[in-house]
């Protein structure tokens, strides 16, 4: 990969030089397309370790999302955080996402929803409350997070949160489906320019699956 350096720009932020992160990101995607999901996770995590090594420990630095190599590095950090969340290492995933938001304060990659899942898993309710306003109001993700958080916290889901979630029919159908297969058809759909509502709903389910398995009684509250 060559030497990786952090270079300041005229826009009061930084870019990452070296590392060929765009190629690394493409390689991880190609591994996934061939079914080598473990290999893709390892590729992303190794690159994440290289990225962390050049970031200063004592202060946060804003990275330039418009710079291709730097943007790819941020996407790698996000992808690795998702990998670790799905693998059950929630604390590492949380640390990665918090680092990502420090480096990308405008949250171009939309890491906040994934961080919300981490906070629910860790039962960090105050941290969750702080970031809830940053979740998009139009997305089906926010009502799901709010309903799931309430269930995780209290064992119940209030009528208003159920009502908000039921407005998103495709997601509710997916949550209650017998199977949630990430097959070739789904992968083609979700990677297209305009994914179907069904594919988007499945993507949300798959991202939340560890929590839905942990709080298995939640799905029953939707019926």
Regions found by a protein language model. Name each.
Residues 30, 76, 83, 117-118, ...:
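Residue-level signature for tetratricopeptide repeat
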Residues 12-17, 49, 66, 98-105, ...:
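Solenoid-like repeat scaffolds
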Residues 34, 87, 122, 153-154:
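Structural motif corresponding to the intra-repeat A-B loop/turn of tetratricopeptide repeats
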Residues 51-59, 105-112, 137-146, 167-181:
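Boundary/linker segments of alpha-helical solenoid repeat arrays
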Residues 5-12, 42-46, 90-98, 124-136, ...:
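Alpha-helical repeat scaffolds
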Residues 148-223:
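Long, ordered, amphipathic alpha-helical scaffolds
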């Amino acid at each position: 990969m060559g030497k990786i350096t952090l270079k300041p720009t005229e826009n009061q932020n930084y870019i990452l030089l070296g590392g060929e992160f765009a190629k690394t990101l493409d390689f991880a995607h190609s591994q996934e397309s061939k079914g080598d999901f473990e290999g893709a996770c390892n590729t992303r995590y190794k690159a994440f370790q290289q990225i962390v090594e050049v970031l200063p420990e004592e202060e946060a630095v804003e990275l330039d999302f418009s710079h291709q190599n730097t943007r790819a590095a941020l996407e790698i950090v996000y992808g690795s955080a998702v990998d670790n969340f799905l693998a059950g290492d929630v604390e590492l995933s949380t640390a990665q996402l918090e680092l990502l938001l420090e480096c990308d304060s405008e949250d171009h990659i939309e890491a906040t929803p994934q961080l919300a899942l981490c906070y629910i898993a860790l039962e960090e309710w105050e941290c969750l409350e702080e970031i809830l306003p940053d979740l998009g109001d139009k997305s089906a993700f926010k009502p799901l997070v709010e309903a799931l958080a309430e269930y995780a916290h209290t064992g119940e889901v209030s009528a208003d949160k159920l009502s908000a979630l039921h407005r998103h029919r495709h997601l509710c159908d997916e949550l209650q489906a017998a199977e949630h297969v990430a097959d070739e058809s789904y992968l083609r759909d979700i990677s297209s320019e305009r994914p179907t509502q069904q594919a988007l709903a499945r993507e949300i389910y798959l991202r939340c699956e560890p929590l839905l398995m942990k709080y298995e009684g939640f799905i029953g509250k939707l019926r």
